[in-house]
Amino acid sequence: GDFQELKDIEGLQVSAVSADLYKNGRDDLTLFYFPEGSNHAVAYTKSSIVSESINWNRKNAKNNIKALVVNTKNANTFTGDQGLVGLDDIARTLLESLKKIENENGYEKTKIKDIIFASTGVIGEKFPVEKIKNNISYLVSNLRINQNKLIWLKVASAIMTTDTRPKLAYSEIKLGDKIVRIAGIAKGSGMIAPNLATMFSFIFTDADIS
């Protein structure tokens, strides 16, 4: 189609699935996994009303992460303890599911603080913890090391809410003897104001950034 070609990013694995959050079969749950760990930087909304997912990230995440879990349909906002405790439950389920591939490949084991979340959608509804947990093992077993345009379209579509089409971009540049790749996906339809609001933008690169 009219989307540019995208390539894989070294050190990143991705997968997406329908957790039936929309009850129509569309993909709505995504996992980004960094087997060797990854530095990350983040800009959150400045609103005083934030998702429990943001509260989790602020409390747990350090500079280095190993997994990002993104769900749509439910913003995990105004969910209180149910939403926050639910994230812990999901994180522990993910840790258990990752054990096999980490043991098989000699990866350092993921810890709770290595996992961050992003949630978008309706506010004030109970966070669908069980639906998400029930699809974690599928996400892990279907992680893709090689990401072509179709894979990137799949994950870009999985983070959408009211968007009319997925948003994604890719570029690469030669630095010395190395080709550095940068890929990005985003969601948001009139949602960037105020202060990022409910917009998501995820940018991945294999550049050596500390």
Positions of predicted regions on the chain:
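Glycine-rich, mobile lid/loop segments that gate access to catalytic sites or pores
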Residues: T93-E104, K109-S210
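Non-cleavable N-terminal signal-anchor transmembrane helices
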Residues: G1-E5, L87, K99
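Short, basic and Ser/Thr-rich N-terminal targeting/leader segments
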Residues: G25-D27, V50, L153, K167
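Glycine-centered structural positions embedded in regular secondary structure
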Residues: G11-V14, A67, G184
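N-terminal amphipathic/basic leader segments beginning at the initiator methionine
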Residues: G1-T45
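Basic, gly/Ser/Thr/Pro-rich low-complexity segments located predominantly at protein N termini
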Residues: L6, A16, F78, V85, ...
